[in-house]
Design a protein with these regions (language model features):
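Alpha/beta-hydrolase fold catalytic core
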Residues: 2-62, 86-89, 305-306
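Conserved HGGG/HGGXW glycine-rich cap/lid loop of the alpha/beta-hydrolase fold
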Residues: 17, 55-101
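Short beta-strand/loop motif that positions the catalytic acidic residue
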Residues: 245, 251-253
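Acidic catalytic loop of the alpha/beta-hydrolase fold
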Residues: 256-260, 286
Length: 306
């Protein structure tokens, strides 16, 4: 009988850990019970409901759309959103499917899915032209937007963009329940703390990991991350086309980014987008818009006011 107690203890601990994760369903009740502030809304798009922020809708300036990265949703843009709101810009940010407060869908999470989500939102808002700012994986999304509908694009502004990396699409893009279970078991206990590695000076961002822990409560988050990764591919052809269309392109990098390492693709980037304007933000890692806000804000304003 005594031998049963260690096994029982381990079983209880295991169940306790599993119960921490992915227990909230983002269905209609989630949307209806959400407490929105004055800038926040939900809209039902083709693949599901989308959470977004919008302000200064009557501004005469070109609307600016902020697209977040791989896993952290639109709150990653909060400092920039507030700054541009105060400067009188019409600003839109949103949570892409599978992230934050938007629907976790059952299908494949592709660049095309995200791009169409943004385009449908802009159609809902009756926006015909906008400047697009893509952070990290959001760079892939704005590239795909330009690929689908270049007429809607004013400026393309890439911030620490991962869209220029060499990627091979997985042969099998379906996500199994086993893959989800293993991802949660292997990654969820440490994934929030890992977000601090995006910063050059993580000690300045106390609580950033705690905020990410909240995302782990939503059922389907792990599947969304796995599916997104499986559906990545090299975007060289799209970027060549962007260059041929003479769309205004700007790239902004943290000078100490260890997540997207500039030197690994800089030569290819010069070949793909030789006419881009490029900026490096000092004393910042993968999130220069947070880590060196003064310098980043000066750069983004110089672009948007040009």
């Amino acid at each position: 009988m005594r031998l049963l107690f260690p096994f029982l203890f381990l079983f209880i601990v295991s169940c306790s850990q599993n119960n921490k994760y992915e227990y909230i369903l983002k269905e209609d009740n989630f949307k209806y019970n959400f407490e929105l502030n004055k800038d926040q809304s939900f809209v039902d798009l083709e693949e599901g409901f989308t959470f977004y922020n919008a302000t200064n809708q009557n501004s005469q300036k070109t609307p600016v759309v902020l697209i977040h990265g791989f896993s952290v949703p639109s709150y990653i843009w909060d400092p920039t959103f507030v700054m541009l709101r105060e400067k009188g810009f019409y600003i839109i940010s949103l949570d892409l499917y599978g992230r934050g407060n938007s629907k976790n869908i059952d299908g494949d999470y592709t660049d095309e899915l995200f791009a169409n989500q943004v385009l449908q939102l802009l159609n809902h808002l009756e926006i015909e032209k906008a400047d697009f700012v893509g952070l990290s994986n959001g760079g892939r999304v704005i590239s795909k937007i330009a690929d689908i509908n270049s007429d809607i694009v004013g400026d393309l502004i890439y911030v620490a963009s991962s869209s220029f990396l060499n990627k091979s699409k997985a042969l099998e893009t379906d996500v199994s329940k086993k893959e989800v279970r293993e991802f949660i078991g292997n990654n969820y206990p440490t994934i929030a703390k890992g977000q601090l590695q995006d910063f050059k000076y993580p000690e300045k961002f106390e609580g950033w990991d705690d905020k990410y822990e909240e995302l782990l409560k939503y059922k389907g988050f792990a599947r969304a991350l796995i599916s997104t990764t499986k559906n990545h591919y090299t975007m060289d052809e799209i970027h060549e086309n962007i260059n041929n269309l003479n769309l205004p392109v700007y790239t902004i990098w943290g000078d100490s980014d260890n997540v997207v390492v500039y030197d690994e693709f800089s030569e290819r980037l010069n070949e793909l987008l030789p006419n881009r304007n490029e900026y490096f933000i000092s004393n910042s890692g993968h999130l220069p818009q947070m880590e060196n806000q003064d310098e980043f804000n000066k750069v983004i304003l110089s672009i948007l006011n040009d």
